[in-house]
Amino acid sequence: MTQPTMPTRRKALQLLAGVPMLPLSASASAALLTACGGSDSAAPSFVSASFTSMAAPTLANAAAMATTTVGSTLNIKLSDDSVRSYQLAYQPFFVTGDMVSDGKGGTILSGGYYDINNKPIIDATVAGKERQYFSDSPDGTSLLTVANPTVTGLKGKAVFAVVQFEYTTWAQDGKTDMYGKLPSPIAVLTLDQDQTTGKLSLVKYHNVDTSKVHGLWITCGASLSPWGTHLSSEEYEPDAFSIASNAMFKAYSKNLYGDETKANPYHYGHMPEVTVNPDGTASIKKHFCMGRISHELVQ
């Protein structure tokens, strides 16, 4: 049966306390909790959580196709076989290109690109307006927890999001195509989950050092491993037989190494794995033994 009434704030929190980690951000948890009403009597226990699907917007509502739309709900099944539904919503932590906290008292460019020496890669296509390149295409993301986190400044529970950035489409001049020409960044976001409301707040952005794995190329979909790591992907493996004439890969090598010929095509097209540390930093490795194929969304 479906429970027709909305639960109280206290009941909702009691139910969700049984969930190992509920990845709700600000407006989603607010929508869940602020609509609560009714009595504060003892509630049945949590059994399971599921999400409903939503139809993709069509040209019948063109405006909805140009923005982020959330029409799905969270359904909580209880031990008395009742189901309580909560409307979800969307709220970003930042937009790529924003300056965000680095967790050390400073700021860092979200989605920013770095070379093999971890120096910012500069977009100089507009004279007098030189700036660091940043991605316009965040892609695969894993939301996870780590045992015994040591990140300072948290008021609630530490939750980590590993976010990879697939590419940037254009340089700032709007004419220079940059697809596949920059080393894909991966970041670890440290999120502070309020234990009263469930709200997630960004407290730290860490850019993962990928120099030991020769940088990353076109990281697309991702998966969360059963052991709590982020399984990335290099969507395409560059063709080594024609690499000397591959303008995209030569530009990639130039941006990464400062040399069009230094990047080795056999270093790309592999399975990268990111392991988050308790302090919100991370390490990365590539599983070369798995071969050079499109490993996107490996489970």
Please state what every model-predicted region is.
Residues G37-S39:
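Bacterial signal peptide processing site
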Residues M1-A35:
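N-terminal secretory signal peptides
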Residues L22-S25, A43-Q299:
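Conserved small-residue
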